[in-house]
């Protein structure tokens, strides 16, 4: 069973490398300042992300509508 097929799991997608500079500028941060997501996370594995990728997580909520989060994929040794 794919983890992402469960209705409670938010959508995960890899941000293309050429879009990362715009994202960093928009939020006024450095790439190392993103919250971290381990390479061993089941959804990181499922979407095929690699260390250094930025993953966009879109969560749906009855109260908040939709919220977007970004995470930096890091190795397990962090």
Curated annotation (Swiss-Prot):
It is found in: Cytoplasm. It holds the Pfam family RNA_pol_Rpb5_C. It catalyses: RNA(n) + a ribonucleoside 5'-triphosphate = RNA(n+1) + diphosphate. Keywords: Cytoplasm, DNA-directed RNA polymerase, Nucleotidyltransferase, Transcription, Transferase. The keyword Transcription applies. SUPFAM superfamilies: RPB5-like RNA polymerase subunit. NCBIfam families: PRK09570.1 (NF007129). Belongs to the archaeal Rpo5/eukaryotic RPB5 RNA polymerase subunit family. DNA-dependent RNA polymerase (RNAP) catalyzes the transcription of DNA into RNA using the four ribonucleoside triphosphates as substrates. This is DNA-directed RNA polymerase subunit Rpo5. It comes from Methanococcus vannielii (strain ATCC 35089 / DSM 1224 / JCM 13029 / OCM 148 / SB). The gene is rpo5.
């Amino acid at each position: 069973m794919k983890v992402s097929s469960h209705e409670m799991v938010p959508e995960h997608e890899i941000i293309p490398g050429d879009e990362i500079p715009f994202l960093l500028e928009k939020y006024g941060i450095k790439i190392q300042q993103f919250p971290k997501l381990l390479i061993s996370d089941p959804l990181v594995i499922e979407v095929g992300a690699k260390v250094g990728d930025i993953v966009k997580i879109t969560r749906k909520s009855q109260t908040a509508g939709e919220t977007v989060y970004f995470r930096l994929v890091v190795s397990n040794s962090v």
